[in-house]
A protein has these predicted regions:
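Extended, charge-rich intrinsically disordered regulatory tails
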Residues: 237, 241-248, 253, 259-278
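Short, well-structured beta-strand-loop connectors
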Residues: 189-199, 228-246
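Cationic-aromatic interfacial patches
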Residues: 27-104
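Surface-exposed, glycine-biased beta-strand/turn segments
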Residues: 97-207
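Terminal peptide-recognition signature
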Residues: 56, 85, 159, 182, ...
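Bacterial N-terminal signal peptides that target proteins for export
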Residues: 2-14
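Zn2+-dependent peptidoglycan hydrolase active-site motif and core
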Residues: 193-227, 255, 260
Length: 278
């Protein structure tokens, strides 16, 4: 009888471990959201899973539940309706279709005390345009390496600015919010959510101290408004490594981390790469 109890108890423990492992692995996968600014997850056939493109840019291919799948970043400007990824091979063209629904993002009104950060001087424009080109290059960077899509939250804190919101600074309309804002004390360590390579750093007019990390296959993180930068250009960083500290540099209302996540050249909602509890 005692042996039966031990066997049953052991079975329950194994089942509990399996259930927890499955739950954690399920939470770790990116989540699909078929709206502008979201992510499409498209199943692919083994052996025919490379070379797919969306809007003429290569898409990230990884394993979802052990099977190949494409992760496709959907631009905020994308129209509702049918879209597809495609690849050409010899005389064949392969297409995978998916349907996008429209989403109405809310509007956020923000007061910036440093008016120069809303209406820059003419003397600022050369710097701003040069930095814009550097940002564009970093966002479109592509390296063909395996990607760990099991992301960590880069900093603990309260999310204060939602991705995709239409922003109005001092009564003037600006581009939609391209990332997630997380409020935290100045000096709080900012962690790399996944391994990658530092492809851009510097003190930028609007973004303040920033770091770009290439996670591979067009998956790019941007961390802005840092008080300190703790990594160097070209450095290989590990998941969980401190890359900088929370700050209030650039165009801000207070200390926080701005985290943008780019996929095949499009800014997407970073929350889709975090566990559902976040």
């Amino acid at each position: 009888m005692r042996n039966l109890f031990i066997r049953e108890s052991g079975l329950r423990i194994l089942l509990l471990i399996f259930s927890l492992s499955y739950l954690l692995s399920a939470q770790a996968q990116p989540r699909q959201l078929l709206v502008p600014g979201g992510v499409a997850i498209i199943n692919l056939e083994p052996g025919n899973d490379s070379g797919y493109r969306f809007l003429d840019k290569p898409v990230l291919v990884t394993k979802i539940e052990g099977k190949p799948a494409a992760l496709v970043g959907l631009p905020l400007s994308l129209k509702a309706g049918e879209h597809f990824i495609e690849k050409s091979s010899a005389d064949q063209v392969f297409k995978k279709f998916f349907e996008i629904k429209q989403k109405q993002y809310s509007t956020q009104h923000i007061t910036i005390t440093d008016k120069r950060k809303v209406n820059p001087y003419a003397s600022d424009m050369e710097r701003i345009l040069a930095e814009k080109a550097r940002k564009q290059k970093a966002r479109n960077h592509y390296s063909m390496v395996d990607v760990d899509v099991d992301f960590l939250r880069p900093v603990e804190g309260i999310s204060t600015g939602s991705f995709g919101r239409r922003r109005v600074f001092n009564g003037q309309k600006r581009r939609p919010h391209s990332g997630m804002d997380i409020a935290a004390d100045k000096g709080t360590p900012v962690l790399a959510p996944s391994a990658g390579t530092v492809i851009e750093t510097g003190d930028f007019f609007f973004s303040g101290n920033l770091v770009y990390i290439d996670h591979g296959q067009g998956l790019i993180s941007l961390f802005a408004h840092l008080s300190e930068i703790d990594v160097n250009l070209g450095e290989q960083v590990e998941k969980g490594q401190t890359i900088g500290k929370v700050g209030a540099t650039g165009r801000v209302t207070g200390p926080h981390l701005h985290w943008s996540l780019g996929l095949n050249g499009n800014w997407i909602d970073p929350a889709l790469f975090l566990p559902v509890t976040d």
